[in-house]
């Protein structure tokens, strides 16, 4: 086969339909950013990079050029924070806000939103799913990458995910191994996905990096409604069939599964585009150091801090009048927000979720969640 001729034909096919519907996944709790992230103010409502915009607002602004306006932008979120979404995104049409009665992870969210957009715009509609709480640099590169993913998904039956080039052996991200190279879109190579691997140990992650074939799983996807609905019917009928039969009223009875587990690890239509834009999923407090570390300061200080023999600390206070004083501390996170002070070693921030379970089970502290 003449690959160049094949890719040229794909490009001609992809230009036939330009409607694109970005969907923002905004139902998460951001528990590992507690106590700053709480039930009444989850991570997506926060600004963590020093800007005036929340993560949700920044995500919407990034996607508006792709959506060609608010009328094509969608958000799916939980009933607990739906009003907060309305306040943060006042221009979002109410009909484009999908409100989950209970959280059922990303597979149910993707299935429901895809069904709704399919009803309104038909099976040829192109959809992209984007987490609300990620940090992305290089907006022009981001837009070009999504355009390439859309071009690929319009051209052939494909569920396209964006892979982030890893720059260190992270144990906190999932990995995607590239398989056969298809061709290039917008000068970006497209690969068939060989396999997904959930959060590996450090040695395995280092091996992945050395091969040059692996990228981080960004959690961003692009596809045509007809393709994803057909694949969900094949690989996740326990999610899509009840939604098709009963609608969102069945939500509490749906299984709680991620889209990676329910579909991406099973489908033969998964493709990956390695992305070149700066990215961080802001998974826990250590992400603040990756974003804001300055060479002339041994600590990351988002508070008034007086320190003696303190290095590698991340220090945050929501009240500018609070002063945090440290002596002889290395590699810690200190967060002061409202009526809570958190002190934790940087390598144990993943355990914050365990603390939240303790608080939830102890009736005295539910107001701290």
Identify the role of each PLM range.
Residues 56, 113, 133, 176, ...:
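Residue-level signal for inorganic ion chemistry
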Residues 139-241, 248-251, 271, 345-346:
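Conserved core of the sugar-phosphate nucleotidyltransferase
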Residues 2-24, 32-39, 49-131, 135-141, ...:
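Conserved N-terminal catalytic core of the sugar/cofactor nucleotidyltransferase
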Residues 3-14, 223-369:
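Left-handed beta-helix
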Residues 24-26, 76, 128-131, 161-165, ...:
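Short beta-strand segments
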Residues 74, 127, 194, 213, ...:
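A residue-level structural signature of the nucleotidyltransferase/glycosyltransferase Rossmann-like core
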């Amino acid at each position: 086969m003449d690959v160049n001729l094949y890719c040229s034909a794909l490009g001609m096919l992809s230009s036939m339909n330009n409607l694109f519907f970005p969907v923002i996944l905004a139902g998460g709790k951001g528990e590992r950013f507690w106590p700053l992230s709480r039930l009444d103010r989850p991570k997506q409502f926060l600004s963590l990079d020093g800007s005036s915009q929340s993560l949700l607002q920044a995500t919407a602004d990034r996607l508006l050029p792709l959506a060609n306006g608010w009328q094509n932008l969608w958000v799916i979120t939980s009933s607990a924070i739906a009003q907060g979404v309305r306040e943060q995104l006042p221009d979002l049409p109410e009909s484009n806000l999908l409100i989950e009665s209970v959280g059922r992870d990303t597979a149910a969210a993707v299935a429901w939103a895809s069904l709704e957009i399919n009803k309104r715009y038909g099976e040829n509609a192109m959809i992209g799913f984007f987490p609300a709480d990620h940090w992305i640099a290089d907006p022009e590169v981001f837009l070009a990458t999504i355009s390439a993913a859309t071009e690929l998904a319009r051209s052939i039956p494909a569920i396209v995910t964006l892979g982030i080039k890893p720059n260190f052996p992270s144990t906190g991200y999932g990995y995607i191994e590239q398989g056969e190279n298809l061709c290039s879109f917008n000068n970006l190579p497209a690969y068939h996905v060989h396999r997904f691997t959930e959060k590996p140990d450090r040695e395995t992650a280092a091996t992945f990096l050395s091969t040059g074939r692996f990228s981080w799983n960004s959690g961003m996807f692009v596809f045509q409604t007809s393709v994803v609905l057909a694949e969900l019917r094949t690989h996740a009928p326990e999610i899509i069939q009840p939604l098709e039969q009963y609608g969102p009223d069945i939500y509490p009875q749906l299984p709680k599964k991620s889209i990676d587990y329910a579909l991406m690890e099973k489908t033969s239509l998964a493709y990956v585009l390695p992305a070149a834009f700066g990215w961080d999923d802001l998974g826990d407090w250590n992400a603040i150091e990756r974003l804001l570390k300055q060479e002339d300061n041994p600590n990351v200080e988002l508070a008034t801090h007086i320190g003696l023999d303190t290095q590698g600390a991340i220090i945050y206070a929501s009240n500018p009048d609070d002063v945090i004083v440290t002596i002889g501390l290395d590699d810690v996170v200190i967060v002061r927000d409202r009526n809570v002070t958190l002190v934790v070693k940087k390598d144990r921030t993943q355990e914050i979720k365990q603390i939240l379970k303790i608080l939830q089970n102890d009736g005295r502290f539910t107001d701290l969640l």
